Curated annotation (Swiss-Prot):
PANTHER family: 3,4-DIHYDROXY-2-BUTANONE 4-PHOSPHATE SYNTHASE, GTP CYCLOHYDROLASE II-RELATED
One of the GO biological process terms: riboflavin biosynthetic process
Organism of provenance: Vibrio vulnificus (strain YJ016)
Residues annotated for D-ribulose 5-phosphate binding in this entry: R38, E39, D43, R151, R152, G153, H154, T155, E175
Binding annotation for Mg(2+) 1: E39
Assembly mode: Homodimer.
Top-rank lineage group of the source organism: Bacteria
Cofactor (UniProt): Mg(2+); Mn(2+)
Stated family: Belongs to the DHBP synthase family.
Protein name as it appears in the record: 3,4-dihydroxy-2-butanone 4-phosphate synthase
Pfam families membership: DHBP_synthase
A GO term for molecular function: manganese ion binding
Catalytic activities: D-ribulose 5-phosphate = (2S)-2-hydroxy-3-oxobutyl phosphate + formate + H(+)
Length: 218
C-alpha cells in the first residue's frame, strides 16, 4: 500500500492537518512525513512553547539522536547563526547552522533537560546571540521564507505548523527510527503515532491546506 492509502484512516488531508494543529495546541507531538520520493521519513515534532523534559527524553530514546531546532530565518539572523558549512551540497539543501548550547543553566549540554534549556533559551523572542555557546548539542535549522510552499521539507513544515497553530514559530524535530536503528517508514510511523497519541500528517497535506485556505505565512 502507498502512503496515501495507509494514512486514509486518519481522515482526509485537511482533517489530518486540523488534528495535528489541535495536538500541538494541547502540547502533544505530531508525526510529519515527507514525500515517498524524497527522504520518505517521519519526524516527531513538538512545539518549543510546550516542550517538556519527558518529550525530549522520548525523542532521544526513539529517534536518531540529532535533535534539531527549527527557527524562522529572521530569528536565526537575530541569533547570528551562520551556516554549518559555507558550501551546502547536501541533496535536500537542509539549512543547518552551527550547533549551539545555552551558556547558562546546563552542565554537559547533552541531557534531555539541558537540551530543553538550550532550545528554550535560543527560541526566546528576546534571546541574544551572546546567550548561546557554539558548538553544542542542539542543531538549529533555518526555515525558508514561504514555508512548505517554498520548500517541502520538515524544517519548513515544523515552523508552518507552529504558526498555523497560533504558537511561537519554533519547533523541535527528530527523525523516528526503528528499534534496530533503521529509519521508520510509513507503517512503523503510523503504529508509533497510535501508541503515543500523535496525529500523523504529510507535508503534501500541509501544502493542500495552505493553498485551500490561502494562508500567507512568514
Amino acid at each position: 500500500m502507498n502512503q496515501s492509502s495507509l494514512l486514509a484512516e486518519f481522515g482526509d488531508p485537511i482533517t489530518r492537518v486540523e488534528n495535528a494543529l489541535l495536538a500541538l495546541k494541547e502540547g502533544r507531538g505530531v508525526l510529519l512525513l515527507d514525500d515517498e520520493d524524497r527522504e520518505n521519513e517521519g519526524d516527531i515534532i513538538y512545539s518549543v512553547e510546550h516542550l517538556t523534559n519527558a518529550q525530549m527524553a522520548l525523542m532521544i530514546r526513539e529517534c536518531s539522536g540529532i535533535v534539531c531546532l527549527c527557527l524562522t530565518d529572521e530569528h536565526a539572523n537575530k541569533l547570528e547563526l551562520p551556516p554549518m558549512v559555507v558550501n551546502n551540497n547536501s541533496a535536500n539543501q537542509t539549512a543547518f547552522t552551527v550547533s549551539i548550547e545555552a551558556k547558562q543553566g546546563v552542565t554537559t549540554g547533552v541531557s534531555a533537560q539541558d537540551r530543553v534549556t538550550t532550545i528554550k533559551t535560543a527560541a526566546n523572542p528576546s534571546a541574544k546571540a551572546d546567550d548561546l555557546a557554539r558548538p553544542g548539542h542542539v542543531f538549529p535549522l533555518r526555515a525558508r521564507p514561504g514555508g512548505v510552499l517554498a520548500r517541502r521539507g520538515h524544517t519548513e513544515g515544523t515552523v508552518d505548523l507552529m504558526q498555523m497553530a497560533g504558537l511561537q514559530p519554533a519547533g523541535v524535530l527528530c527523525e523516528l527510527t526503528n528499534p534496530d536503528g533503521t529509519m521508520a517508514k510509513t507503517p512503523e510511523i503510523i503504529a508509533f503515532g497510535k501508541q503515543h497519541n500523535m496525529p500523523v500528517l504529510t507535508i503534501e497535506d500541509m501544502v493542500m491546506y495552505r493553498n485551500q485556505y490561502d494562508l500567507k505565512l512568514a
